[in-house]
């Protein structure tokens, strides 16, 4: 029998044209790398979030090999002032804790401080941001959990924090101006009675776990079995958890495609805990689960028509439902920003996806890639058979529990694969990310696409105002920033990509649409106000402002923010409100950041005003807390670390006051020739940019100066009556006293000078007929635009002609004139620039830091480095740097003493800078071990051996 090939059969006749292997099949679209693996992952387990952006600003993501967790964050680059993603920092404690197990899920808690990491065996470890965004310490080890495949986590949720926050419903245009609707948003339980962290997990085997932290910081756990109708229902694939007013709502999906709904209550015994109660000792609260409702929805499959025909088209075959698998399960709550409260019931949303490579035999019957199946959760009365009415009841007023129902809504189809569904902007927007990298915003209630063109007079979110994500290269995992102004994606190769939301700002087709521009500014303002009220990091908003807005638009945003919060800039009377005002430092911080250029270039004049006010506020609050924590001096002596901080801020406050006086003396000399020509005086004042003059005229900064004087006077008087001090505390307090004693102006004389300025400002307002209702306008002009309003020109004239000359007899003007104020960083002269390039000042302690090798002259640095291969005069040192203002702090560990720790926490400086930006740990740098001289009027801060040893370490 001859072989087939002997007849000379051409192989090309079997497969098509010569040189081609085209089989006549329809061409398939190219899928992103790793998409098939991602869809399989989403199908097999509900908890598979590989990247998460916390509300504190930290981005954590799992490496491509699944063994490490890295963190990044937004930061302002000191060299050029550009906002970028930081370099990645590996979290070594995570790798050690999980011992080689594959990491599958990340989840931040509501404040964005604690991070939960789950591996493929269901083991959970918990970490916390300690002193910087890239400094995370372990709290709970994964070794506490057994290594069991049945313990895999399919659903996870953190307990909310029990605190009421300020929120904003919307912005509506009224008579040409935007009106913002603030209200108080109450938290949704359940809560930990000690206000500690709590984590709820659902496992594959149908076990609900609560990991909670005891008052001593240790973690404990309780667990219970979810009620199931059969054994096969226990094998869960997905679980969605959310806090509601009626308890925790849990939706689960089992391997047999059953959807179960539970309502779980966590009961604590005792319900309250007072750690201050000593006798009798109060036991720690112990939780327990109580199941309230259970509902089973068996039909959770895909029902639909052919995607190439209209909905409900008759006579057309349905697409193959059995091909679809559940790849996502979520519970969507109604918007939290609602002044009437969250009254609408939640929705259950399930994502069903078709296999990536389906059979091509009947392409006309192929369904869409993704189908969104939705159920409305309804509660109604439990209806009984009429015969039950004839049965006598012992309880006439017996209450029947409401029935929990799931009402299926219309399905939503998409020809693209959905890889993520996120509820952003406080529940106002549902963001769905697809496999091609596109992000589409939907209305959570109707699933209608939000395109931003519906109503230009009402703004509820960034998406509704027209912000969108432009098409970019695809990624497999996504997480949105705290205020949804940006997103970070993780691609198939484990690389992160930053994506920013964009807007036309009214510039379309060469024309300007004022309505769209105004709506965009209002949306950014609304997002900023919501972030301030919820104590959320707003660096993503700042990123948009810096990259996309013109200086004029930035000024419009600042004015809107002051009006929306609202902030009354007039503090001529109610000065005590300054100390505890939550929004003033937020606005000052973003003002100062908008004018930052780079580390070596002076800020813009308009931003230098809020920057100086932030420093004055820091010193004022520091002195107030110093006296508060040292009232019981006999039982709680002064802490050396606190006194060192007070010493540095005292020197800074004195030098700042001398700098203000020196500038005013120069201004008085410049304007002396114009004393008889008021018109010329006014014109010259318009062209004068003087930071000290604006600081004195503004009631806000003038009040802070008065608070500082009060604190300095109290410290000076308290030295004689202080409890006996020893060691470093005695040295620091003695230096504080000596610094005040040798000052070229007495504190009472400076207070008298401030009183004269205050009198001149009051007379100017009174002379112009400005009452309390009219004064906020000029005060805002000073603070926001750094301009002297016309109503205060007479006050400037009085200050320069009367108040300043009257002070000359009470000061040592030569000492003030010869002082070196370059270390303050507020002037634009060459001496300040040289100091800025060679030294850093600890922004918290106000103590000059040791110069790093990069700041030393190049020849000296090279000479030191060439000595035997390494420098004998340099040591390694780590510092913290603010991601917003780029200032540094030499502390790289939490305060050691309890008093110092309480002080730093009360000041809000444990994780954040004076400006409100977050800290990041810099890589190790070389610093000079030899002390260098401080500028005139600024003595070198003494560093005790014990403190120096602590500062040398890193967290």
From Swiss-Prot:
Q: Where in the cell is it found?
A: Nucleus
* Region Disordered: start-end pairs: 855-874
Superkingdom of source = Eukaryota
Output compositional bias ranges, type Polar residues: 857-873
Q: Name one GO biological process term.
A: positive regulation of DNA-templated transcription
Q: Which UniProt keywords apply?
A: Activator, Nucleus, Transcription, Transcription regulation
- Known InterPro entries for this protein? Mediator_Med16, Mediator_Med16_C, Mediator_Med16_N, WD40_repeat_dom_sf
Q: Which SUPFAM superfamilies match?
A: WD40 repeat-like
GO CC field: mediator complex
Q: What family name appears in the similarity comment? A: Belongs to the Mediator complex subunit 16 family.
Task: Relate the protein's function as given in its record.
Answer: Component of the Mediator complex, a coactivator involved in the regulated transcription of nearly all RNA polymerase II-dependent genes. Mediator functions as a bridge to convey information from gene-specific regulatory proteins to the basal RNA polymerase II transcription machinery. Mediator is recruited to promoters by direct interactions with regulatory proteins and serves as a scaffold for the assembly of a functional preinitiation complex with RNA polymerase II and the general transcription factors.
Q: Which PANTHER family match?
A: MEDIATOR OF RNA POLYMERASE II TRANSCRIPTION SUBUNIT 16, THYROID HORMONE RECEPTOR-ASSOCIATED PROTEIN-RELATED
Question: How does the annotation summarize its subunit structure?
Answer: Component of the Mediator complex.
Q: Per its record, how is this protein called by name?
A: Mediator of RNA polymerase II transcription subunit 16
